[in-house]
């Protein structure tokens, strides 16, 4: 194992960066708080005055609940405004503009490339391979591209959006080994709850160049709350916390998220995940029988990527039936594809009905 530390990969000018010390980060105690220029009165729209004060930057109860959920230490976890903020923090914290590259695997979630562009970090693309088992990551090619470009960050979306494929844990570990001391491998597990592949978080004890992204937006149904987690080496988490905006987690969102992680709420979430997985299999089996459907990719997420003979006609037929899906036709290599989120059984039946009626009318 390499003796290099992940902190050697951080931008030189940020290693001693203190960041902004907000009033809420001080350890002072008292019953009259006049240190943050907040209002002494609540707003009429907030009868219990629960939002008149700035929030805890990293709410302790929520952070502990998330760490327990994901099986990591609290000091290894940073809460942010969705995974988007964590992606941005990683790129800004590690990549020197116009020097340190970011590796991505298109077609894939677009925010990796957006954050790289905003940081002026060179972008290296290693496209997913379209094979008999679906669109999947070519991990050896990804590793080689990262080494050739001297990349600082490698983003592996698993399960991948929009492809739906998951990367075996052994392949992720191989990438971590090959890139230790050279690059941070970021495994985006936004759809991890729907996958058969175990989380990469368990590898963190052996590889300090691993970072994992998780979210409450998908399986936990809290998309508007914007609660994302970055799980990584504790020193790296502390550094990125100093790079983060002062108050990233609004109090109402933190309260709701902590309630969503109670045992009864988690039991409901698990039942819904089980139902989504069953509906995913049912919808997949039904779609492959629909005339005009060219290919339905296997998926480990809560969606299906579908190729059509006429994707425009399929998109319009669904829209006319009141069903909005994600049009992928502008994405390179997906000019005939739509991404369909798994809904309720009734919603999925509406998808099938609209596509079947389109073919009957043709």
From Swiss-Prot:
Pfam families associated with the record: Aminotran_1_2
Alphabetized UniProt keyword annotations: Amino-acid biosynthesis, Aminotransferase, Histidine biosynthesis, Pyridoxal phosphate, Transferase
Pathway where this protein functions: Amino-acid biosynthesis; L-histidine biosynthesis; L-histidine from 5-phospho-alpha-D-ribose 1-diphosphate: step 7/9
Stated name of the protein: Histidinol-phosphate aminotransferase
Gene3D superfamilies for the chain: Aspartate Aminotransferase, domain 1, Type I PLP-dependent aspartate aminotransferase-like (Major domain)
Enzyme class: transferase
Keyword Amino-acid biosynthesis tagged: yes
Superkingdom as given in the UniProt entry: Bacteria
InterPro entries, sorted: Aminotransferase_I/II_large, HisP_aminotrans, PyrdxlP-dep_Trfase, PyrdxlP-dep_Trfase_major, PyrdxlP-dep_Trfase_small
Bilayer-crossing regions: none
Catalytic activity: L-histidinol phosphate + 2-oxoglutarate = 3-(imidazol-4-yl)-2-oxopropyl phosphate + L-glutamate
A biological-process GO annotation: L-histidine biosynthetic process
Top-level taxonomy: Bacteria, Pseudomonadati, Pseudomonadota, Gammaproteobacteria, Lysobacterales
MF GO annotations: histidinol-phosphate transaminase activity; pyridoxal phosphate binding
Gene name of the encoded protein: hisC
EC number: 2.6.1.9
Subunit structure: Homodimer.
Cofactor(s) listed in the protein's UniProt record: pyridoxal 5'-phosphate
Chain positions found as N6-(pyridoxal phosphate)lysine: 218
Family the UniProt entry places it in: Belongs to the class-II pyridoxal-phosphate-dependent aminotransferase family. Histidinol-phosphate aminotransferase subfamily.
